[in-house]
Amino acid sequence: MALELSDVKRIAHLARIEVSDGEAAQTLTQLNQFFTLVEQMQAVDTTGIEPMAHPIEQVQAPAQRLREDAVTEPDRRADYQQCAPSTEAGLYLVPKVIE
């Protein structure tokens, strides 16, 4: 997928971003390089490769890996909501400010 200069200018217009011709040309080059890289990655045969939950596992030492998720604090929502003027179903009720 290759973009053209008119595509970059259209995207900038839709995003309400003002870009000069030089910036548009530079952005076009960068986007086309990015799309080329994506196409190369999509061409790689990944059948039989197990997806990784966290790719960082491949570069970090075992001692620095992400810790297991565990509850470390008790649920004190009811305690915190006792001082609220109005709550319902565990949510804080606030006055309507937008008409």
Curated annotation (Swiss-Prot):
Disulphide connectivity of cysteines: none
Pfam families: GatC (PF02686)
Class of this enzyme: ligase
The reaction(s) this protein catalyses: L-glutamyl-tRNA(Gln) + L-glutamine + ATP + H2O = L-glutaminyl-tRNA(Gln) + L-glutamate + ADP + phosphate + H(+); L-aspartyl-tRNA(Asn) + L-glutamine + ATP + H2O = L-asparaginyl-tRNA(Asn) + L-glutamate + ADP + phosphate + 2 H(+)
InterPro entries, sorted: Asp/Glu-ADT_sf_sub_c, GatC
MF annotations from Gene Ontology: asparaginyl-tRNA synthase (glutamine-hydrolyzing) activity; ATP binding; glutaminyl-tRNA synthase (glutamine-hydrolyzing) activity
Keyword Nucleotide-binding: yes
TM region(s), chain numbering: none
Keywords: ATP-binding, Ligase, Nucleotide-binding, Protein biosynthesis
Gene3D superfamilies: Glu-tRNAGln amidotransferase C subunit, N-terminal domain (1.10.20.60)
GO biological processes: glutaminyl-tRNAGln biosynthesis via transamidation; regulation of translational fidelity; translation
EC number, UniProt record: 6.3.5.-
Highest taxon above the source species: Bacteria
Subunit structure: Heterotrimer of A, B and C subunits.
Family: Belongs to the GatC family.
Alphabetized HAMAP family for the sequence: GatC
Function summary: Allows the formation of correctly charged Asn-tRNA(Asn) or Gln-tRNA(Gln) through the transamidation of misacylated Asp-tRNA(Asn) or Glu-tRNA(Gln) in organisms which lack either or both of asparaginyl-tRNA or glutaminyl-tRNA synthetases. The reaction takes place in the presence of glutamine and ATP through an activated phospho-Asp-tRNA(Asn) or phospho-Glu-tRNA(Gln).
Protein name: Glutamyl-tRNA(Gln) amidotransferase subunit C
Organism: Ralstonia nicotianae (strain ATCC BAA-1114 / GMI1000)
Lineage: Bacteria, Pseudomonadati, Pseudomonadota, Betaproteobacteria, Burkholderiales
Gene from which this protein is expressed: gatC
